[in-house]
């Protein structure tokens, strides 16, 4: 097993909207609109009308992790996000460095960062922050150190958990549709 710090294997906040045409439409994601990997609201808005915190542009295989109130689990993994997806500066974005592709699985990194014990640990750090609300610094996440098994083991493990997550999401969608159908029948 190899031991790596997040900052050694990932680039943080690598892409921003700086230099983009301000008249383009973006899909904006606020921290409260993402919980445990599930988006509840993407806001289409012109970049020039977006909140000043709409700065972080996503690319493929991006991990987003809220720096505010980590106990609320505002984090997610974006495998193939829309080209114009922008998230709040309240998120830390992490992308695997090119030299670690095929050595570290980004899905596995996401699974490590979203473990309940780690969420609690980061929340404890956030509560001690010198601000009016519990918040983290990017370095609090970047300095985390993990042991990584062989790439194939990481990939299999992450694949299994992501399949389970997709099945859970599908079941939730089916339940929402069934609930809507029941309302139509009884209203």
Q: What kind of feature is each model-predicted range?
A:
Residues 104-140:
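Short, positively charged
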Residues 30-44, 70-89, 121-124, 131:
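Short, ligand-facing micro-motifs at secondary-structure edges
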Residues 1-18, 147-187:
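Non-catalytic DNA-recognition/assembly elements of restriction-modification systems
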Residues 5-19, 27-66:
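Sequence-specific dsDNA recognition surfaces
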Residues 85-91, 128-158:
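A short glycine-rich beta-alpha junction/loop motif
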Residues 54-56, 60-118:
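A short beta-sheet element
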Residues 19-27, 123-126:
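Short coil/turn segments at secondary-structure boundaries
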